[in-house]
Amino acid sequence: MRCLLSLILFSATVAAAQQPDPDQLFSSAVDAQQRGDYDVAIRDYQKLLQLQPKMGDARANLGAALAHTGRLDEAIAEYKQALETAPDKNAVRMNLGLAYYKKGDLADASHEFEDLQKLKPQDVQLAILLGDSEVRLGRGNDAVQMLTPLEAQNANNADFEYVLGTALIQAGARREGAAKLEQVAKATQMADAYLLAGSTYMDLNEFEKSRIDLEEALKLNPKLPRIYTLTGMARDRTGDPVAAEPAFREAIRLNPDDFEANLYLGAILYKRRDVDAAKPYLDKALQIDPKSSMALYENAMWRSTAGQYDEAARELETVIKSDPDWLEPHVQLATVYYKLHRPEDGAKERAIVEKIRADQQSKGPGK
């Protein structure tokens, strides 16, 4: 019995001697984290937390190391646990919000940032993160209300102005938002800002401004999504189809299923009377979006030129049903009816054309 007891005591002594020192583990983990050796840092923090599971700083640091390696779900779990014992809970909540943000869980990120922003209403980085989260959640009005009081002291902060500009556009103040994005783009040469400003001006039918911004975006970053399509549209709408054509061809090379690039290129070739070359692009556009009024209209124009008047009439009638106030389909349908020897139908369409024109003159420029 005495021999067995001594063996038990000896085993306990050896185990105690082999137990890692928590201070050394913490120091080793911090050193590894600071030099970017996150795998070692994670290993040492995990060992330490097996010994001292309520050590909040270590758990928060483990969350940060996991986040750096892209293990965001694990990082989030560690941050949540760290909130129970960490001395600086606000710092942990900030990191938790950032982990949600990087993961794309914007609702939870916004919740964390919003609570922190109430405690630190002048913190510009926090405001930027919250504002961007709100915009990406479709809550542009909320972002504008939160950011606007901070603008005076942050007007030279490009990130702040970019987020405010995107929020304004989403909230309906599109010209003001686009102007802010232009200022950011000129100051920072940020291609994304030029792209969003240019596409916004296009939506506002301000095509010259749109083209200037989109051309700059294309120069800065030709890999931006849809940049060739948008630039081609701006060139075409400023009366430069020759310059638009290569942009659309490049867009189709990058994405053969680009609806607008196929539609616009087909229309350019049709207007040039290169009808055989136009047909595959117009067909492709209609295949991509069979319900598109524009695609149906352009195909109807091709059919009319090719002498396929019955098919052209059917497509124009479909367009008019979906958009009865669009003038040009009525004009073309009247012409097609006369070619089909349907003068009564042609006369009815002519009367509709005159009515739409009169309405447009009373209201201002229309479609």
Locate each region found by the language model.
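Structural marker of alpha-solenoid helical repeat scaffolds
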Residues: 51, 85, 119, 152-153, ...
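Helix-start (N-cap) detector for alpha-helical repeat units in TPR-like alpha-solenoids
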Residues: 22-23, 56-57, 90-91, 124-125, ...
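Alpha-helical segment of the N-proximal tetratricopeptide repeat
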Residues: 21-47, 51, 64, 68, ...
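Position-specific recognition of the canonical hydrophobic site in helix A of tetratricopeptide repeat
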Residues: 33, 60, 64-67, 94, ...
